[in-house]
Amino acid sequence: MNSSIAILLVMALIMFSLDKSYSTDDESGNKCAKTKRRENVCRVCGNRSGNDEYYSECCESDYRYHRCLDLLRN
């Protein structure tokens, strides 16, 4: 009886840790909320482009973010 409870507790801990690690990847895709640097870079590129959607595209897409970094370096 005690060994089955111990096994259930271990399984519950494993499931909880897996659920917690996957739930952080399931956010809305806004990576600007995670890092202040990315938010600032995307804001500058959005202001320079004059395109209202550029900021949100930069926050969601790694390709757009790296392209923005390249534009700011030049």
Swiss-Prot record:
It comes from the Eukaryota. One of its GO terms (cellular component) is extracellular region. One of its GO terms (molecular function) is toxin activity. Disulfide bonds join 32-59, 42-58, 45-68. Residues 1-23 form the signal peptide. It is found in: Secreted. Keywords: Disulfide bond, Ion channel impairing toxin, Neurotoxin, Potassium channel impairing toxin, Secreted, Signal, Toxin, Voltage-gated potassium channel impairing toxin. Expressed by the venom gland. This toxin inhibits voltage-gated potassium channel currents in DRG neurons (IC(50)=44.2 nM). In vivo, insects injected with this toxin showed signs of neurotoxicity including twitching, paralysis, and body contraction. Belongs to the scoloptoxin-03 family. This is Kappa-scoloptoxin(03)-Ssm1a. It comes from Scolopendra mutilans (Chinese red-headed centipede).
